[in-house]
Structure formats: structure tokens, C-alpha cells
């Protein structure tokens, strides 16, 4: 168990979030957003998309737009768009982390951005921050994690929570709690590859939804385990690499 006086891995990750975001990174995020929208629109017209639309017709209504024309509450919108975006997956794979960040981060950030009525720049900055955390957590998990777990979901939930925390302007303490609550919800096993169905899409959508919930809970004051990434009973027990070998502070 790490000392309570030692910054947790989560806190170290969040310390990086204060760095200025370059315009070229915002432009790259905007390009990924356009590509992701294309994937979502295409997925809407598939069998899986039709099933998601049928579910959305009975989901809790709200102010957040979803592809298909439904206006849902924030969490439901993240689930709907996050699932749709995974049907024809955007190829933004980070090979080292084995994560497709857009599947979870775009859907979560879009939902919260609509609810909070943030600026386009704030949205893109949140996406960049979410991408970084999802990728770094994926690198921590390593490729062995991917053998049994769907890394886009299990690691992407941390990125989704980070993006939402950025949009809500949470401080480091609150954002640490957001990532803690995200880790408590991390899920997604690869049995969905062994059988037909739409469970892979559910995993990405659910992680987007969980990212929204994690940030909202943290904003409300719900504390969580600071050492969710490296503690004795941490999320993703397969995290075996010493932190120094991950070179956390390198870009």
C-alpha cells in the first residue's frame, strides 16, 4: 500500500493536466471528432444501431442530443453515442496502449459539453486531456491486460472521466475522486469476441456513461480511493510495471 503522503499515480497523471494545450493538439482532436461523428452516423444505420435507438426511445429524456434525434439525459446520451461510435470503430488506436480513445471520450465529453454549454475550445481541451489519460493508463495496463479485458473500455473510462472533470472545472482533489470512481466502474471482458452480439458496443458506451457519472459524483463530493491504479487491490490487477518504467512524465 502506498503511503498516504505519496502522490498517487492518479494524482501524478492529473498533475500533467495543467500543461498548456497546443493548437495542433486541438486541431487533431477536432479531426478525430469529425471522424468519430462519421463512425457514429454509419453505426446508427446498422442492426446494433437500431437496437440502441429502440433502447434510447425509452431512456430518460434530457437536453443532450444523440445521433438518431433523441434528446436524453447526460448519462444516457453518453451511453447511446458511445455505443454507436464503436460499431464501425474509428481507427485512432494507440498501439502501445491498445486503446481506441474516441469510443468513450468523445461521447462522454459531448454529453457534458451540451449540458454545461461550454465553449468549443473547452470541449477540445477536455478531449485532449482525456486522450492522454486513457493512453497512459493503457500503457500502465500493458498488452497482457488486453488478452482478457477490453482495454478501450477498462482504460477508456479513465479518459472519459478526465474529459468530464475538465469540462466541470474540477480541481485536482475532485478530479482524483473522479478517476477513482471511474476505476471502480472499469469493466469489459473479451468474451464478446467469442460470440455474436453487440456487447462490445455496450462496453464502450457504458464506459462513456461511467465517465460522466464518475465526474458528477466527484463534483458532488463523493470521495474514492486515491490509489485506484497502483493500490494493493487496484483496478486492473494486471498492472505489474513499476511506474518508473512507464516514464510517466515524458510526453
PLM region descriptions:
Residues 2-249:
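N-terminal core-entry segment
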Amino acid at each position: 500500500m502506498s503511503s498516504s503522503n505519496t502522490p498517487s499515480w492518479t494524482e501524478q497523471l492529473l498533475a500533467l493536466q495543467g500543461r498548456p494545450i497546443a493548437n495542433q493538439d486541438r486541431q487533431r482532436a477536432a479531426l478525430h471528432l469529425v471522424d468519430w461523428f462519421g463512425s457514429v452516423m454509419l453505426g446508427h444505420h446498422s442492426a446494433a444501431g437500431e437496437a440502441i435507438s429502440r433502447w434510447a426511445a425509452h431512456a430518460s429524456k434530457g437536453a443532450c442530443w444523440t445521433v438518431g434525434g433523441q434528446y436524453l439525459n447526460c448519462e444516457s446520451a453518453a451511453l447511446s453515442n458511445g455505443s454507436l461510435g464503436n460499431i464501425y470503430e474509428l481507427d485512432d488506436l494507440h498501439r502501445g496502449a491498445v486503446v481506441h480513445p474516441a469510443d468513450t471520450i468523445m461521447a462522454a465529453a459531448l454529453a457534458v459539453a451540451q449540458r454545461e454549454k461550454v465553449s468549443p475550445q473547452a470541449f477540445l481541451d477536455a478531449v485532449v486531456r482525456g486522450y492522454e489519460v486513457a493512453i497512459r493508463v493503457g500503457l500502465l495496463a500493458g498488452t497482457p491486460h488486453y488478452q482478457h479485458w477490453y482495454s478501450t473500455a477498462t482504460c477508456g473510462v479513465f479518459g472519459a472521466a478526465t474529459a468530464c472533470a475538465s469540462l466541470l472545472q474540477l480541481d485536482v482533489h475532485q478530479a482524483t475522486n473522479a478517476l477513482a470512481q471511474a476505476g471502480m466502474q472499469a469493466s469489459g471482458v473479451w468474451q464478446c469476441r467469442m460470440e455474436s452480439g453487440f456487447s462490445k458496443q455496450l462496453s464502450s458506451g457504458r464506459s462513456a456513461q461511467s465517465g460522466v457519472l464518475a465526474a458528477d459524483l466527484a463534483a458532488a463530493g463523493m470521495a474514492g480511493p486515491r490509489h485506484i491504479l497502483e493500490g494493493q487491490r487496484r483496478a486492473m490487477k494486471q498492472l505489474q510495471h513499476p511506474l518508473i518504467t512507464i516514464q510517466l512524465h515524458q510526453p
